Amino acid sequence: MRFIFGIFLFITILFGEENMSIYDIEVKDIDGKVFTMKKYENRVMLIVNVASKCGFTNQYEGLEELHKKYFDKGLSVLGFPCNQFLSQEPGTEEDIKEFCSLTYGVEFEMFSKIDVNGENAHTLYKFLKESSKGVLGTETIKWNFTKFLVDKNGKVVKRYAPSTKPSDIEKDILDLL
């Protein structure tokens, strides 16, 4: 019996993640509430690793504009703070929340700080990187404000470079709404 259980466990570990859906992944919002991405089922998602002290930080404005314009039509903009790039997100969740709210009027959903690369990379970012490779087929996130567009069925449609302005993604979003 233990042998059969061992084989079952091995097969589950070996092949389990291949069948994983984005909706199975747990996330923690900036206030510490844990839930699965199933919350966003049947919504288009724009998932972005963000930072408060980056040359691209002003993209918060464009992300918020997309949120305000398309939330009611089915878009969820999701911001995941990350401190892996030159420590450009050093604050606590409370610091980040306050900065985003006061400086950019951010109302789109923000999450707890995560790693996007390395062995401690969040499961969501492992999934995103495997689903949509970067330049030359690499998986590594190169910088803050890398963006992933996900359709209503949970399929990663496209990955955008940090330099891509949120307004430049608008047409792709409209095609999915």
Label every model-predicted segment.
Residues T123-K126, E130-L177:
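Thiol-/selenol-based redox modules, centered on thioredoxin-like
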Residues G74-G91, E107-G118:
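Thiol-based oxidoreductase modules, predominantly thioredoxin-like and allied folds used
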